[in-house]
């Protein structure tokens, strides 16, 4: 056997397979950028910014980082909303508080659900569309977004039904 294989095993021992950040278990075998995108509210652009703020190479494997670097990443995730411009956040001008925040994980899901429920309650146009289960953002609905499995009109079946109905009456 070669001497390289034990070194690979030693690297695997140092690797954390799950890294917990903000109520989310992240895959430690992925790069920092890719692992952070598994969190709700963090996309590729935000993940790059967080990696820069934490002074970590975005291509490094997340589970191979030492505890200090992981703590830096956690701190960068928590402080992200305070350090970036307003247009880079995901929850701008909250209805009740007027604050601009960047929400992550369950907080983001709850705030979106509350916003939709408020729109439904006051019967705003978007709220009515949400109630009816229709498209909200102005997409066409005549031909796209159909939920039924039927395709077109079967003219022959309609003619047969009319012939049967007409034959019974005579």
Swiss-Prot record:
Pfam families, A to Z: Ribosomal_S13
Keyword Ribosomal protein appears in the UniProt entry: yes
GO biological process: translation
Entry superkingdom: Archaea
Single annotated GO MF: rRNA binding
Keyword Ribosomal protein: yes
GO annotations of cellular component type: cytosol; small ribosomal subunit
Ranges where the record places region Disordered: 128-170
Biased composition regions of type Basic residues, renumbered to the chain: 128-140
Keywords noted in UniProt: Ribonucleoprotein, Ribosomal protein, RNA-binding, rRNA-binding
Function as written in the Swiss-Prot or TrEMBL entry: Located at the top of the head of the 30S subunit, it contacts several helices of the 16S rRNA. In the 70S ribosome it contacts the 23S rRNA (bridge B1a) and protein L5 of the 50S subunit (bridge B1b), connecting the 2 subunits; these bridges are implicated in subunit movement.
Family: Belongs to the universal ribosomal protein uS13 family.
Assembly behavior: Part of the 30S ribosomal subunit. Forms a loose heterodimer with protein S19. Forms two bridges to the 50S subunit in the 70S ribosome.
Record's protein name: Small ribosomal subunit protein uS13
Gene (name only): rps13
